[in-house]
Amino acid sequence: MSNVIEFYKQDFSSTLFPLNTNLILIENHLEELNKYVYEKILNSEMTEHSFLSQQKVYATKPKNHLRRTIKLDPIAEFFIYDVIYRNRTKFRGAVSEERKCFGFKFKDGEAIKLHEAYANFKSDLNSLKEEFSYYLKFDIASYFNSLYHHDVCHWFTSKQVGETDSIFFGQFCREINSGRSVDFMPHGIYPSKMIGNEFLKYIDLNHELKSSKIIRFMDDFILFDNDQNVLKKDFIKIQKLLGSKGLNINPAKTSLNSEYQEVSSTLSTVKQALMAVIPTDGLNNLVSGVEVSDQQHSEQTALALSEVQIEQLLNLLKDNQIEEEDADLILSFLKNYSDNLLIVLAEILKKFPNLIKQVYSVSLRITDKELLANVLLEHLESEHLFLEYELFWLGKLVEDCLLDVSLIGKLLMKIYELSNSYKIAQAKILEIPINNFGLKEIRLDFLKTGQSDWLAWSSAIGLRGLAVAERNYNLDYFSKASPINFLIASCVKKL
């Protein structure tokens, strides 16, 4: 990996809200972004420039729970990738063989891929289960939302980064959240994952912990020993260590292996039926932030299914008693048989909005695009309660594989209308360079108001398909509203 652009591009599709507005600027306007950030925003003598307070967004979690985070604008997103990339050597590997963490760092010049890190974690986990009689598993409740700005900044300084980078990072953390000290860390981007993983090394380094082995995948801890009392004492100690940083354990995800096995022994009828069709051992105990697709990739799972198996899996997807984790697993098994999913896709979209990214992945492989478009439009016109994350990924699905279908105008405008309360989902539609169906007029309205927000920025990016003279004329007025507007306009003009 030669530079920050490659780092950003490698991570782009894995993020929660990948907007092309940011990608286009970082790919095509890096030098200008760099100058603005380091010569103006981070120049103590130019106090009129600063990082903007960032847009709150909500990704989904199972059972209608929401994951609150922020979507960084192009300038802020460039900075966090740049500062972490330049300081990537400060992020080290495991403390020792007895205290191991996995992934979220660079190795041989490349950011370690999630599925590779998880494969190593899973390999150690399986070996240690055989070696020790007991293990205790737990994770941190709302980890990224609970991180305290000053704790993270002090930690970053302690990594012996340059004094200026330490100051710059502190300014970034403070300004993107309007000075609020918690709930500032962006979710779902690799630099944040590197920070979150490395920050917890103070637990790994604590010599008061006596468990024979401790392994950690981000904030998911597993302690191993042949003595339950050792595990319990360490568990109490770790809670106190985490408490010193305002962090708490999630009680619902805390289990001792014997308790876990007891719960696992009483499986739902759907789960039992699934296991009768496909061996699923080990594919349902995910740690935080690891999707089934990553886990399957880590285990190089590639099953050739018979027609009978495909039909059985589709019938399970239709079962009203199916749990989300089982539906997720079945979708991953059927990823190479995506055309078969069209008959159940509407039901999946309705019951499991949290699976929209998995639906996006499998839908890309569907060959009958017109039928897929009809299914999506019918869903969009239903009484379903649409969430921001769902609408965003439906917009991305339309952009990435349905631009040539006959229903493209209806799909785009319906997603845009349903996203009325969701700026980032609307921005997804506005940045698509299609100028029919009223989208051009909507964009021009945003550009003429003098506003400087996601609706205006994505509208400017969406103009890149216009004739040069008309495009540049409209961008000239937009560019005068703010420095970020000017940067975006100057980037689009040279595309």
What name fits each language-model region?
Residues M1-W155, Q160-E163, R174-I189:
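Conserved two-metal-ion catalytic palm core of "right-hand" nucleic acid polymerases
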Residues Y85-T89, L205, K240:
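Short, intrinsically disordered, mixed-charge
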Residues G93-E98, I214, N248-I249:
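Short, polar/charged, Gly/Pro-enriched helix-capping and turn/loop motifs at alpha-helix termini
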Residues C101-G109, I222-N226, N257-Y260:
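Beta-rich nucleic-acid/ligand-interaction surfaces
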Residues I112-M218, I222-K232, K245, P279-L495:
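Conserved polymerase palm-domain catalytic core
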Residues G188, S192, K245-V277:
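Conserved catalytic core of two-metal-ion nucleotidyltransferases
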Residues D234-L242:
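Short amphipathic alpha-helices in soluble, non-transmembrane regions
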